[in-house]
Every structure is written in C-alpha cells, then in structure tokens.
C-alpha cells in the first residue's frame, strides 16, 4: 500500500514539475541571436504553425487554445551580459493573448500587477496591485511619452530594469510606466511581430549605443493584432492582404511582419478586459468574423466596408 501511495505521489510530483517548467521561459538579451532564439522558443511552445502561411522553414503561428493555467513567466536575462545582478526581473504574461499582467522582483518575489489584472496570482509570489491599468493609453499618460518615436536600446533597458527593481508600493509611477512600455515592446510585441523583433534586435550587437525607434507603422501593427489574427487564417494565396492601413503583398511580406497571432475562434481570446481604446488589439467580439476575398485581395471586413462606402458616396 505504501509503495502504491509513493508511486501516486511521485507521479503527481512529476506532472506538477513539468507544468511549472512549461510555464517558465527565458528571454536572453545577451546578443541579437540569443534574443531571437529565445523568442522563437516561446512562440513554438505556445503556438501552432499555419501551413498556408509558410516559406523557407518560417511559418506564421497561431496561439494554441491550450488548457490549464493561462499564465507563463518570462525571465529577463543578459541585459548586461557581464553583470549577473541584472537577472532578477520576471514578467508574468497571459498565454492566450500575450498581455503582460505585471512584473516580479525575484529578490523578494513581489508580483506588481496592473489594476486590470488584480485577480491574477502567480505561485510563490506576494501580489501588490498597482494604481494604474496596463492599457497603452494609461502607460503613455503616466510615462509622459508616446510609443511612436519611443527609443529602446541596451542602456535604456538597463535603466528600466533598475527602476523596476527599486520600486515599492502600489503607485504606478512615471519610471515604472516607462520601464513597462519598453519591456512590453521588446517581449510581448516582439513575440507577436517580427517587424518589431527585427527593428530592436540589431541594437543588441551595436556597440555605438544605437536605439530602436518605434515607428508609426510598428504602432499600427500592434493596434491591429486582433484584426490581423481574424483575417490571416483565411489567406490562401490571394494577391494581397488589407487590414486598415496595413497591406501585405506576399507570404514573405506577412512573415516579415507578423510572427504569432491570436486564436480568434477560441472564446478566451475574445474576452476584452482592456480599456476601450485597446479593443483593436483584441479579436473581434464576434468570433465568426472572417476575412473577405474581393478582387483577389483578402480584406478585413471593416476595411472593405469603409472603402466600398466611400466609393458609393463619391460615385
């Protein structure tokens, strides 16, 4: 009997250990290569390749519907490759939509979570709810900067790291808001978009201190992730794809910009808990909305509708 109980306990211990490991990833900023490799590991772990959008061994991935815990941790490493003390920052991310819920200072295991994620807990941490939410509108207002034109390099990430590690209390301060804007961009947004990954990664091997500057086009991608996620699964070789001001003329153009999309036909991805201004980054509320092919172009329905209406008015 004791042997049976021991085996059962061992089985559950192994399962629990596997689950814990599966929820933890490392994002290594030591070099451009380690950074991209780390992103690809996370993408492959949570996404499934779309065979219809694949070229030369690179595919667009869709987030798996998954089961169990919807959170995973991203441990930041290599901000300063020569200083081990810069290895105590952990970001807690929702799996089904890649929203960063907050950060953990691993020196004391305090989890500083945004106000809109006040219900979120993570094993082994003590939660503190910040006074502001995670919407880009709130973060930009508190930070006093705009995402368009925001500069990020190794030095600014080091400063951001130190700001987060020195934070205490519930106030969403300017320094914390700025730091989270930067880290969300080079983690969650870089996971979603190769265009952002590509723009930032080259700064990691640049000794001159050159910065990645977030462009209006980059910001536009991030605000249309939900619409892109709804439309791109319907791509089957059409001449181009149109979503708002975004246009892709080939598979390679899609793959060069987008890496990972939402699973818009799984209910958890369609729950919008962000502020109303953030809704464009979510899947359409109606999970049945799909892309529309018109004149060999794959359209987002609202984009096509707006264009056809303008043509009707002008005719």
Curated annotation (Swiss-Prot):
GO terms for biological process: negative regulation of translation; symbiont-mediated modulation of host virulence. InterPro entries: Ribosome-inact_prot_sf, Ribosome_inactivat_prot, Ribosome_inactivat_prot_CS, Ribosome_inactivat_prot_sub1, Ribosome_inactivat_prot_sub2, Shiga-like_toxin_subunit_A. Disulfide bonds join 264-283. Its main location: secreted. The active site is at residue 189. Its EC number is 3.2.2.22. Belongs to the ribosome-inactivating protein family. The A subunit is responsible for inhibiting protein synthesis through the catalytic inactivation of 60S ribosomal subunits. After endocytosis, the A subunit is cleaved by furin in two fragments, A1 and A2: A1 is the catalytically active fragment, and A2 is essential for holotoxin assembly with the B subunits. This is Shiga-like toxin 1 subunit A. It comes from Enterobacteria phage H19B. The gene is stxA.
């Amino acid at each position: 009997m004791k042997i049976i109980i021991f085996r059962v306990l061992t089985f559950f211990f192994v399962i629990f250990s596997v689950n814990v490991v599966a929820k933890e990833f490392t994002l290594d900023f030591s070099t451009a290569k380690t950074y991209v490799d780390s992103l690809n590991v996370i993408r492959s772990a949570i996404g499934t390749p779309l065979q219809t959008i694949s070229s030369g061994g690179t595919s667009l991935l869709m987030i798996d519907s998954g089961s169990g815990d919807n959170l995973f941790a991203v441990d930041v490493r290599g901000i300063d490759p020569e200083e081990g003390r810069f290895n105590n920052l952990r970001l807690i991310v929702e799996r089904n939509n890649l929203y960063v819920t907050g950060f953990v200072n691993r020196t004391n295991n305090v989890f500083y979570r945004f106000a809109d994620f006040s219900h979120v807990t993570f094993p082994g941490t003590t939660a503190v709810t910040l006074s502001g939410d995670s919407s880009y509108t709130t973060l930009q207002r508190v930070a006093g900067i705009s995402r368009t034109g925001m500069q990020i390099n190794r030095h600014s990430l080091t400063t951001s790291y130190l700001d987060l590690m020195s934070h205490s209390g519930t106030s969403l301060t300017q320094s914390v808001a700025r730091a989270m804007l930067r880290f969300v961009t080079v983690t969650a947004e870089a996971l979603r978009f190769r265009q952002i990954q590509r723009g930032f990664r080259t700064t990691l091997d640049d000794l001159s201190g050159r910065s990645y500057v977030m462009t209006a086009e980059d910001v536009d991608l991030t605000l249309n992730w939900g619409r892109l996620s709804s439309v791109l699964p319907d791509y089957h070789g059409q001449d181009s794809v149109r979503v708002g001001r975004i246009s892709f003329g080939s598979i390679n153009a899609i793959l060069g910009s987008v890496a990972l999309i939402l699973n818009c036909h799984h209910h958890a991805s369609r729950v919008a808990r962000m502020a109303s201004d953030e809704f464009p980054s979510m899947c359409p509320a109606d999970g049945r909305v799909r892309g529309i092919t018109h004149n060999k172009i794959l359209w987002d329905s609202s984009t096509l509708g707006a264009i056809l209406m303008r043509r009707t008015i002008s005719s």
